[in-house]
């Protein structure tokens, strides 16, 4: 039987009670909670010791050859069973991992903090008119509510605003969570599984007037891992300010984030998703230090976007640029599987094959700023835009650049690394091969235009016999002269 833990003053009620951490737990109480977390593992070890007498294969090996030489005949049920021992070893490791997560949870929940006020108290004070147009409290003073897996997340966000998930638990979203006020969700690495038939999992709506807290603005998710194997809808639908900090999106078959307002994604990971970040017209995307891997469309930009310091690998399309953007210090690797290239886009009225970096034609938009990027085994599509496309200090390693018919005179490649780049100009489209129907990024299927191209690499490549590489095009302000 498990021993009972006597209650102590100032100690959190336990891991299975819904209560906020208000007081500072004593060191003895922390040891008691950690000991309680190990009771289940210890009981399981004792039960295994009494039930089975066979030792693991790695620990107590039986010399079967010596027993056969001595005339001992082994029965069918005698001797070690490696398969059973492996199962026991896996169970033991899983129990150890659970114990580590339990200790981590205890440590996080019992750590002393300067939390003094609840969100509801701030709202009451705001209703009385005491907090209009002023910031009276800071983020660390707002009390944290530790969310239990059985609680309603939408109601908890309205009541507490600042939520923390337990790393030793997994959460399930079974209905749409509508957020209409400030929210700050701290994931602590917890896994949130989305299992609902609704169209949207998190609906982030416009926010009204409310109390001002320094460090709490808009809707923020930090260090949460979302799993969408069972979900077919949109993960985030936001028309308000949304910040995603260190969030993981794993195996989503639809859109991860769809925004009509400002969205900031920092240090996020998108793995095996259909569409990562989609910025609708008049939206503002800020994507930096994110990882995109094995996605079909990582980024779709219809408004403005700042895309910096990201890494992408094995994506059918890293960025589909319909609006305007700034691309700096990104590292993009193309796909090795040719089946990932069988998508088209109809963004400019013509069905072109979707490339790794696809810049759509637009009569009023300027070319994107493209500096200090690494493109490896990429295909790049350049549609017609205003001005000149002049990438600076970009490495086009084993990459292919496709130019639409009128783009040839608007591209300048002075100042790039062009040893293994190949440029092709579209002469016309072959009508005889329009029978191929491909899946489009808009959701339907279209007939693909197969272009007839002309290699213009040497016409656009810099004359290295005339232009020296020891010029300012390849230098940076932070480089030393010596």
From Swiss-Prot:
**What GO biological process term is on the record, naming one?**
symbiont-mediated perturbation of host apoptosis
Instruction: Provide GO CC annotations from the record.
Output: host cell cytoplasm; host cell nucleus
Q: Which GO terms describe its molecular function?
A: ubiquitin-like ligase-substrate adaptor activity
**InterPro entries associated with the record:** Adeno_E1B_55K_N (IPR006717), Adeno_E1B_55kDa (IPR002612), Pectin_lyase_fold/virulence (IPR011050)
Q: Where is the composition biased (Basic and acidic residues)?
A: 83-94
Q: Region entry Disordered: which residue ranges?
A: 73-94
Task: Please list the residues that carry the modification Phosphoserine.
Answer: 476-477
Q: Where in the cell is it found?
A: Host nucleus; Host cytoplasm
Family under the similarity heading: Belongs to the adenoviridae E1B 55 kDa protein family.
Q: What is known of its domains?
A: Contains a PML interaction motif that allows the subnuclear PML localization.
What is the official name of this protein in its record?
E1B 55 kDa protein
Species per Swiss-Prot/TrEMBL record: Human adenovirus A serotype 12 (HAdV-12)
């Amino acid at each position: 039987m498990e021993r009972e833990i006597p209650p102590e003053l100032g100690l959190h009620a336990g891991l299975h009670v819904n209560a906020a951490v208000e007081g500072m737990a004593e060191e003895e109480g922390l040891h008691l909670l950690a000991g309680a977390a190990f009771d289940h593992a210890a009981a399981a070890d004792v039960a295994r010791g009494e039930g089975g007498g066979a030792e693991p294969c790695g620990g107590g090996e039986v010399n079967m050859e010596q027993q056969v030489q001595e005339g001992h005949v082994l029965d069918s049920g005698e001797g070690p069973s490696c398969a059973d021992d492996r199962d026991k070893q896996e169970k033991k490791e899983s129990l150890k991992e659970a114990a580590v997560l339990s200790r981590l949870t205890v440590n996080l929940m019992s750590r002393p903090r300067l939390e003094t006020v609840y969100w509801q108290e701030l709202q009451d004070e705001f209703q009385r008119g005491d907090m209009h147009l002023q910031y009276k409290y800071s983020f660390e003073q707002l009390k944290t509510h530790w969310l239990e897996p059985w609680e309603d997340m939408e109601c908890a966000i309205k009541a507490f605003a600042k939520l923390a998930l337990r790393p030793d638990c997994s959460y399930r979203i079974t209905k749409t969570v509508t957020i209409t006020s400030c929210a700050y969700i701290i994931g602590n690495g917890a896994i949130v599984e989305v299992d609902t038939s609704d169209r949207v999992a998190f609906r982030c709506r416009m926010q009204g007037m409310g109390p001002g807290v320094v460090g709490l603005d808009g809707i923020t998710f930090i260090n949460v891992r979302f799993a969408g194997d069972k979900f077919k809808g949109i993960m985030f639908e936001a028309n308000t300010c949304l910040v995603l900090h260190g969030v993981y999106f794993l195996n989503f078959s639809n859109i991860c984030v769809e925004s009509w307002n400002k969205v900031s994604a920092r240090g996020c990971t998108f793995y095996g998703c259909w569409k990562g970040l989609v910025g609708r017209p008049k939206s503002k995307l800020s994507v930096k230090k994110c990882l995109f891997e094995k996605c079909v469309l990582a980024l779709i930009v219809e408004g403005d976007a700042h895309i910096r310091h990201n890494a992408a690998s094995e994506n059918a399309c890293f960025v589909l640029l319909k609006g305007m953007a700034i691309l700096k210090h990104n590292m993009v690797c193309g796909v090795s599987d040719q089946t990932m290239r069988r998508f088209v886009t109809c963004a400019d009225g013509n069905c072109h094959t979707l490339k790794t970096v696809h810049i759509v034609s637009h009569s009023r938009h300027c070319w994107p700023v493209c500096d200090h990027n690494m493109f490896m085994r990429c295909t790049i599509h350049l549609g017609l835009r205003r001005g000149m496309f002049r990438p600076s200090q970009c490495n086009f390693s084993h990459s292919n650049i496709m130019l639409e018919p009128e783009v040839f005179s608007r591209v300048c490649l002075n100042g790039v690394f062009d040893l293994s780049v190949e440029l092709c100009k579209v002469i016309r489209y072959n009508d005889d091969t329009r029978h191929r129907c491909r899946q489009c990024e808009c959701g339907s299927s279209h007939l693909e235009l197969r272009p007839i191209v002309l290699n213009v690499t040497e016409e656009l490549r810099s004359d290295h016999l005339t232009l020296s590489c020891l010029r300012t095009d390849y230098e940076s302000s932070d480089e030393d002269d010596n």
